[in-house]
Amino acid sequence: PDGSTRKIRSLQIPQSNWQDESPISLACSDIDGVNTYRISINNRHTMGIGRLRLSSAAVKDNWEAEAGWTLRSLIRGQHPEQAKEAFIDPARIIDLSDAMDTKGNLSWNAPEGNWTILRIGHVNTGMKNGPAPAEGTGWECDKFSSEGADAQFAGYIGRLIGPNGPLYGGMLDGMLMDSWECKTQTWTANMEQEFEQLAGYPLRQWLPAIFGYVVKDHETTTRFLRDWRATISSLATEKFFGGMAHNAHANGLTLAFETAFGDILPGDILEYYKYADVPMCEFWRHPSDTFVGSINFKPIKPTASAARLYGILVGNFA
């Protein structure tokens, strides 16, 4: 009202990846007495803003990346000062799964008060492999299950090297999985059991945090989301990359694969390369002054570090 201004927050936008199509949520401390906001962006290159939404709700900073919906650098530092009343009390979360019928109709006598109902389900990612000929194109397999790896191997390499395949009899000695271009995955059929086995506590009570809500407090939510991303990393590593390595070696093939973790999918890039006979990355140099193709655009250095860690050769596809 008196015409004065004050800075609410200043930060560097997290580094993202080339398949990131998710919004970015930035949290700030509670503020009062403000009716006009000014948002300034200093960017090296031209950048368009599709939509800007201001909200009074408490959300986790950059939760889209924290929850594994996309891969970005994570924001660390002091948590915003927000009223605890805006956080979700875990003790007040009610599981209504048994109150919903098979058609998705909810029958529930809600206690007095204001309630937010989260209807959570899962479908496939909507991604298909490519580039590929029409007869070789289909839905991406489940990367968090051994069955997914087995199905992908059997449907492609297995046909080539099988008794009726054109490469039967030892004609093929290796296989390469190219760059990961199927965005991210966040669920599998037995995700709750897998999470509890790896993290040591039930998942369901914390599901709201995967959608940006602050459960209990910022620090506790951050710790849960760390366990969540670790589960995603472990499942993709052991079920898919480990499964593909098992299938390859069982058929006398060496396995090379390019980056997924540190490129598109959140995960431990040093961990999953243990299943590569040849860890690979890719690089190119764009003719214009752009981040695309630069040394940090692809995780080249972590790939080389993984090769040194496991004492194996590193490959490059350029």
Q: Whereabouts are the PLM-identified features?
A:
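Beta-sheet entry/capping signal
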Residues: 36-38, 51, 114-117, 169-178, ...
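Phenylalanine-focused residue identity feature
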Residues: 87, 144, 153, 195, ...
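Mature extracytoplasmic enzyme cores
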Residues: 1-226, 233-234
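Extended amphipathic secondary-structure runs
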Residues: 101-108, 118-121, 239-255
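Generic, well-ordered alpha-helical scaffold segments in large soluble proteins
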Residues: 152-159, 163, 174, 178, ...
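Hydrophobic targeting/anchoring helices
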Residues: 250-318
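Short, Lys/Arg-enriched charge-dense amphipathic segments
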Residues: 188-203, 244, 277-289
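Generic recognition of stable, solvent-exposed alpha-helical segments in well-folded globular domains
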Residues: 144-152, 170, 186, 190, ...
